[in-house]
């Protein structure tokens, strides 16, 4: 886990809120930091942008490059064509694989169609893929904690379909069976709620006491950091607004975390126009954060809308500083001078 992650929630809350618990008694906004783009999303979006610059339109992208409407619409206007399946891409064309990763069968399909591929899979997702392959080679049963049908889960499970079982939530544990309880390991989708994942793992361990942990934390640093920041500010908020799309797992989890941490209400919005003024009735403090696939321009739009309703004092709640940067895929890296 990168050193920017602060999982000590109580301490994080005191530190973060120490600077905002002053004499402000009127309407205010608590603005979570960190929020927005993570290193994997930044890399994926730049990958499509660079591919368009280098090769020109159209560039095909298998699935949404990241789960955000604004980002996808912006790239589509620039010449990206988003498809659901590889066979929708013309033979010989360029296709970018999304940040969520793909199964080996997708690479095989692309090769059969002579597609030129650029893999924008987040390196932290690739890490989970490699773990799945490693433990499948050792003939483990792999319990993949994640949301059934999510692109990332489909891709990871596809690395070892005969060894992976998806465990969607804590209640799904009762249905899990394994061949050898002494050779079972859990892995996870990178964008889950930390708390719900740990509850699922707790139940799995009750059923399989020798359950092994992944070699390193699978839930990504950015997912954890954003949840920590929301937990720090939510107890002070009557309302939390999470900027993000409905199909963004990590954004949806932030709404759940806010409610679980004490916010009276929490809502997910794509744009400022999605905000219902009725939400502000009786509200003094509004918390604002955004999912890991959300550009800052959308957060600024929400802050402007809040200011129109009198919430013009913005106070940061900082629980971590993120500096991680991932290298671009080699196919679109700038040539060395």
Swiss-Prot record:
Mind telling me which InterPro entries this protein's record contains? LytB/IspH
The EC number(s) given in the record are: 1.17.7.4
Q: What is this protein called?
A: 4-hydroxy-3-methylbut-2-enyl diphosphate reductase
**Source organism per UniProt:** Mycolicibacterium vanbaalenii (strain DSM 7251 / JCM 13017 / BCRC 16820 / KCTC 9966 / NRRL B-24157 / PYR-1)
Does the record bear Repeat in its keywords?
A: no
Q: Which residues bind dimethylallyl diphosphate?
A: 67, 100, 150, 248-250, 293
Catalytic residues at 152 (proton donor)
Instruction: Quote the Gene3D superfamilies the UniProt record gives.
Output: 3.40.50.11270, 4-hydroxy-3-methylbut-2-enyl diphosphate reductase, catalytic domain
């Amino acid at each position: 886990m990168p050193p920017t992650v602060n999982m000590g929630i109580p301490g994080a809350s005191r530190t973060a809120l120490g600077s905002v618990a002053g004499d402000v008694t009127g309407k205010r906004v608590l603005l979570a930091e960190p929020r927005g783009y993570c290193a994997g999303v930044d890399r994926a979006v730049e990958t499509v942008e660079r591919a368009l610059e280098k090769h020109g339109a159209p560039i095909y992208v298998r699935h949404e490059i990241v789960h955000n409407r604004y980002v996808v619409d912006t790239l589509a206007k620039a010449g990206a064509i988003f498809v659901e399946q590889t066979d929708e891409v013309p033979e010989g064309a360029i296709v970018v694989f999304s940040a969520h990763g793909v199964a080996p069968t997708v690479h095989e399909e692309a090769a059969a169609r002579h597609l030129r591929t650029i893999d924008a899979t987040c390196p932290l997702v690739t890490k989970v893929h490699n773990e799945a392959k490693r433990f499948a080679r050792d003939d483990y049963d792999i319990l993949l904690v994640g949301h059934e049908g999510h692109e990332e889960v489909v891709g990871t499970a596809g690395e070892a379909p005969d060894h992976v079982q998806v465990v969607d939530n804590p209640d799904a544990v009762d249905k899990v069976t394994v061949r050898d309880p002494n050779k079972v390991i859990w892995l996870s989708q990178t964008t889950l709620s930390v708390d719900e994942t740990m509850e699922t793992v707790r139940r799995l361990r009750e059923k399989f006491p020798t359950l092994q942990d992944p070699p390193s934390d699978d839930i990504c640093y950015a997912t954890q950091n954003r949840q920590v920041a929301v937990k720090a500010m939510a107890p002070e908020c009557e309302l939390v607004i999470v900027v993000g799309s409905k199909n963004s797992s990590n954004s949806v989890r932030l709404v759940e975390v806010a409610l679980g941490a004490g916010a009276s209400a929490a809502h997910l919005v794509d744009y400022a126009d999605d905000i219902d003024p009725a939400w502000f009735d009786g509200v003094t403090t509004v918390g604002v954060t955004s999912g890991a696939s959300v550009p800052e321009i959308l957060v600024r739009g929400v802050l402007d809308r809040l200011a129109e309703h009198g919430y013009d004092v913005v106070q940061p709640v900082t629980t971590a500083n993120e500096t991680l940067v991932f290298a671009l895929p080699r196919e679109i890296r700038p040539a060395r001078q």
